[in-house]
Amino acid sequence: MYTSVVRLQNVFGFFTTVAFVVAAFIAASDFLTERAPIVRTLKTTSVQVVRGRPHYYSSKKEEYAVINFSLDADLSSLFTWNTKQVFVYVTAEWPAADHAKTNATNEAVIWDTIITSPSADHLANIGPVAMKKLRKSAGGKSIDPNRGKLSLKNQRHKYKITHPSGKLAMTDNVTLRLHYNVQPWVGLLTWDQDVDYGYWKALKNGVSKRFKLPAIKEKKPASAGAR
Amino acid sequence: MAEQLLDQVRDVAEGQIDFEGQKLVELLVNVTLALTGVVSFLVGYILQDIKLALQIGLAGTALTFILVVPPWPFYNRNPVKWLQVGGGLVPPQSLIVDEKSFR
Amino acid sequence: MLSGLANPRQAAVQLMNFGLILSTAFMMWKGISVITDSPSPIVVVLSGSMEPAFQRGDLLFLWNRNVLAETSVGEIVVYNVKGKDIPIVHRIVRKFGKGPEAKLLTKGDNNVSDDTELYASGQDYLVRNDIIGSVFAYIPFVGYVTILLSEHPWLKTVMLGLMGLVVVLQRE
């Protein structure tokens, strides 16, 4: 019997199918959009090593590297209709103690930021004033690739970095590296890549010059809140 | 009395439609939902606006529900002409016939 | 329903069909588990600590094999902490060393501090074995039903009531 309940079930069933197919197409449309992110500059502006404690009640003293940097990058091609946010992060990378034998490295994030697409602005975790400003910055557009243009001069680190051994001073061959993670509205999560895949080009010039961490600066840091 | 009332409620809740109506419903569901999907993807992709795509999709789906679920009169334009009661043979009671084809 | 009781063969067929559906779902889940090498290859986001990337109710697909490269900094992983039931979805922000012994530190994008507090007491870092998968694909919202049902148990009653109503109003 073809009753209202049966029709309701059938329509809902076909709706889920259609929704799934459309979502698959949206996810696939990512692969047809060119991505050509480039980094123009990524360099350190000040590097220090200070002594500190992991948290206030700890008696353990550790060495912390405090790295500030400048960054000029154009990630605007990552913003399409299916981009929810781009998570941009800068890591410091240095060879581990047994690097010669195992090729092992250490890597730690020193700074990150979330760039939302205008379609996801309402989800951003910011105050009402900043939210208003953010929404205004999109100017009513549904996508805003200009947000992917980063120009940071002498950017303060967000995280002081440390090592489980507590020793970091005089570490050599440290590099900074820019990474990104594109979060879609539906589909695959993608990260920066070293080689080209189809329309997606590798991130160019995303590594800084090698540098060496200095000796410990004998001054008590204002806050040892590196965590 | 209560049985009659329940029967009336059942009639309303059931929302039966005739065979021609069922055919029409099937066609309408397939066409409207598929069209909604295509339009929402194309408009969203061309205007690069995923919110608009979502709105079109949901609006089209809501429209389909409203169009198809209630037993609108135009689904009942071809009522089945049953044979007269007591006119022919009485089928044996123990016969089990597939529900759908029987009704 | 009543016809099923009158005819044992039909009842048996219905029972078999029901069993078939259940076992198919179970086998698919386990099959995906084997392919992804993850005990729980699809998870629903339960907290807002990764906002705005993931909201509560979003569906995440996990991959737990290191085919081309090791699990590294920047990946969003789901991990278990000893003594806690609920797996956590956070991003790796530090990695020291290489291989199964590498020390990993995680942090939620929306959290101010890293996860040291969330780990078991005395545990400062995760190792690869604590991780049950890295997020590789995402579908928004569809898992929200499970959150609704677990947080508002009265909804289950409402659903049962609705089903009962449908049965009452349907003619046999």
From Swiss-Prot, chain C:
Identification of the protein by name: Signal peptidase complex catalytic subunit sec11
Question: What does the UniProt entry say about where the protein is found?
Answer: Endoplasmic reticulum membrane
The reactions it catalyses are: Cleavage of hydrophobic, N-terminal signal or leader sequences from secreted and periplasmic proteins
Record remark: domains: The C-terminal short (CTS) helix is essential for catalytic activity. It may be accommodated as a transmembrane helix in the thinned membrane environment of the complex, similarly to the signal peptide in the complex substrates.
Q: Which residues lie on this side of the membrane: Cytoplasmic?
A: 1-14
User: Which residue ranges does the entry give as Lumenal-facing topology?
Assistant: 36-172
Q: Glycans attached where?
A: N111
Q: Name one GO cellular component term.
A: signal peptidase complex
Give the keywords, sorted: Endoplasmic reticulum, Glycoprotein, Hydrolase, Membrane, Protease, Signal-anchor, Transmembrane, Transmembrane helix
Question: PROSITE patterns this protein is in?
Answer: SPASE_I_1 (PS00501)
Name the residues annotated as catalytic in the UniProt entry: S49, H90, D115
Q: In which family does this protein belong, per the annotation?
A: Belongs to the peptidase S26B family.
Organism (species):
Neurospora crassa (strain ATCC 24698 / 74-OR23-1A / CBS 708.71 / DSM 1257 / FGSC 987)
What InterPro entries does the record tag this protein with?
A: LexA/Signal_pep-like_sf, Pept_S26A_signal_pept_1_Ser-AS, Peptidase_S26, Peptidase_S26B
Q: Name the gene that codes for it.
A: sec11
Per the record, membrane topology reads:
Single-pass type II membrane protein
Q: Where are the transmembrane segments?
A: 15-35
- Tell me, in one coarse class, where this protein mainly resides: endoplasmic reticulum
Looking at the record, which segments are called C-terminal short (CTS) helix? Answer: 158-169
Quaternary form? Answer: Component of the signal peptidase complex (SPC) composed of a catalytic subunit SEC11 and three accessory subunits SPC1, SPC2 and SPC3. The complex induces a local thinning of the ER membrane which is used to measure the length of the signal peptide (SP) h-region of protein substrates. This ensures the selectivity of the complex towards h-regions shorter than 18-20 amino acids. SPC associates with the translocon complex.
